[in-house]
Design a protein with these regions (language model features):
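A glycine-/small-polar-enriched, mobile loop at the entrance of the PLP active site in fold-type I
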Residues: 1-12, 16-17
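Conserved C-terminal alpha-helix-loop-beta "cap" of PLP-dependent enzymes
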Residues: 244-298, 302
Length: 322
């Protein structure tokens, strides 16, 4: 069965039990519905995941208690990292203790964060999860398995939008959850049941395309990382600011909104488009659909083109944007 073949490949790469979905969004939603968390810490840049949690907290009503999204400050109140123990008298935990509930049910981290390419201390949150009994889930889409190994840092579940680096050709939608072997098989079975009842099964053709793509995954991403380094070294000498680097993806800012718009419109080889992880270089002006992101910021997903060709295209686009 093609679906099990591609899941087995992903299991071999990440080291857990893989469950594929029709999209990254459906994978994230499936985990939320499976855990049904009451108290959540959310660190996500991707707007779709933010919306999924927002809708869940608005619609879900457990024993007449609204689902609560905790802040980082509240998490730090709950857990004393120096003593490696919970602060029982924490105001953020006391209401949960009084109702005999966990201080935290789900910790969702997007690492690195999109589009600012910021990192979080996964191991600190793993300690917090161990103390509270929470599930630690990592959206590792932006780094890919070659850039980050969340299970080695204490994660329980890893999520990828396989549309991006795993597929790598911008020709399919897909998502996957990988469950660490420390969790019971019952948890994975619940995810499989959720997938079936929600109709979030990945199509046969898309599954075959993903299996095809996994055969070149390492070749593609290694080439993208090598090219990325060349482009960033060139960009460091240009009039740009706030350069945040991650292998194969980075963000930078120009001086004004008009310059950012002009840069994208002036590209000849690279595409001015959303998404990332494909074999073509994409430049995304995210502010056009997410106004919470700076209007001067551009996110670049490097493809497999020759570095000199990308630099030439960027150079003429920067001149047009002056």
């Amino acid at each position: 069965m093609t679906r099990r073949r591609v899941e087995a490949v992903i299991e071999a790469i990440e080291g857990g039990q893989a469950v594929t979905y029709s999209s990254g969004q459906s994978a994230a939603t499936a985990l939320i519905h499976c855990i049904k968390p009451r108290r959540i810490y959310l660190y996500a840049g991707y707007q779709g995941v933010q919306l999924a949690f927002k809708l869940y907290t608005e619609r879900q009503n457990i024993e007449d208690e609204k689902v609560q999204l905790l802040t980082l400050e509240q998490c730090k109140e709950i857990y004393d990292s120096e003593k490696k123990e919970l602060r029982i008298d924490s105001p953020s935990w006391r209401p949960a203790v009084m109702k005999e509930k966990r201080a935290l049910d789900l910790i969702w981290l997007e690492c690195p964060n999109n589009p600012h390419i910021t990192l979080v201390d996964i191991e600190w949150f793993a300690e917090l999860a161990a103390q509270t009994g929470a599930c630690l889930a990592i959206d590792s889409t932006l780094s890919s398995p070659l850039g980050l190994r969340p299970f080695e840092h204490g994660a329980h579940v890893v999520m990828h939008s396989s549309t991006k680096y795993l597929a790598g050709h911008s020709d399919l939608l897909g998502g996957v959850l990988i469950v660490h072997f420390s969790l019971s098989d019952v948890f994975t079975c619940k995810l499989l049941q959720e997938r079936t009842t929600d109709g979030a099964v990945m199509g046969n053709f898309e599954t075959w395309l993903l299996l095809r793509s996994m055969r070149t995954f390492s070749l593609r991403v290694r080439r993208q990382c090598q090219t990325d380094l060349v482009i960033v070294q060139w960009l460091e000498k240009q009039p740009v600011r706030y350069l945040r680097l991650l292998p194969a993806t980075f963000s930078f800012e120009l001086q004004s909104e008009s310059q950012a718009k002009s840069f994208g419109r002036s590209l000849l080889l690279c595409a001015h488009a959303t998404s990332l992880g494909g074999v073509e270089t994409l430049v995304d002006w995210i502010h056009s659909y997410n106004t919470s992101i700076s209007s001067t910021l551009l996110r670049v997903s490097i493809g497999v083109e020759e570095p000199e060709d990308i630099i030439q295209d960027f150079e003429q686009a920067l001149k047009q944007a002056e």
